[in-house]
A protein has these predicted regions:
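Short, low-complexity N-terminal intrinsically disordered segments enriched in polar/charged residues
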Residues: 1-48, 52, 184
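Residue-level recognition of short loop/turn positions
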Residues: 53, 150-151
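Hydrophobic/aromatic beta-strand elements that line small-molecule binding cavities or substrate pockets
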Residues: 94-99, 140-146, 159-160
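Short, surface-exposed alpha-helical recognition segments that flank or form part
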Residues: 22-23, 71, 132
Length: 184
């Protein structure tokens, strides 16, 4: 089982390159820039794609304030720092099989995979066999990327997850060799 973070934006980039409408092309470009910054763990690069009052919505956990940051860019910075950087779970892939785009938003859909370090899962209270290994979060996910037409920036992300990607995570052990290096 391999995790290839470079797959995340392949379809978005292809769709952007064939798009003739300049506004829709810009919107796809924002998502592409956001995805690449996220893959590099570049929080400032992610925040640069967002409006001044961003909003993230995780529809599967609407009451969880950490997973639904909004209001300012500092709340988004804190979200990425806590959920991606501090956990070490920055190696991710959205194996995207659908991209829909218009003047108001972009929608991406596919299988989300994230490599969680064994030590992170142990700190979360799980009984981990190998602390030095990675374990694969996996779930079908759709992301709606609404765009603020006045600012020409992403409002944020609205995610819809098919299943809990943590279910069975300890059965999906991978090594660093199973993670394809970034090529950006």
């Amino acid at each position: 089982m391999k995790l290839n973070p470079n797959n995340t934006w392949t379809l978005v980039e292809a769709r952007m390159n064939e798009e003739k409408d300049p506004i829709t092309r810009r919107n796809l470009g924002l998502v592409l820039e956001h995805m690449k910054a996220e893959a590099k763990g570049d929080i400032e690069g992610v925040v640069a794609t967002l409006t001044e009052k961003p909003r993230y919505v995780a529809h599967d956990v609407p009451g969880n304030e950490l997973m639904n940051p909004q209001g300012d860019k500092d709340s988004i910075r804190a979200f990425y720092d806590l959920t991606i950087i501090q956990t070490g779970a920055h190696q991710l892939e959205l194996d995207c099989d659908r991209v829909i785009a218009d003047h108001h938003s972009v929608m991406t859909e596919g299988v989300m995979r994230m490599a969680y370090p064994g030590r992170t899962l142990a700190a979360m209270g799980m009984e981990v066999e190998d602390l030095d290994a990675y374990y694969l979060y996996q779930s079908r996910m759709s992301v709606v990327w609404p765009v603020d037409s006045k600012e020409g920036k992403l409002i944020g992300e609205e995610t819809y997850t098919g299943t809990d990607g943590m279910d069975g995570i300890l059965d999906r052990k991978i090594s660093q060799d199973d993670i394809v290096p970034l090529s950006i």
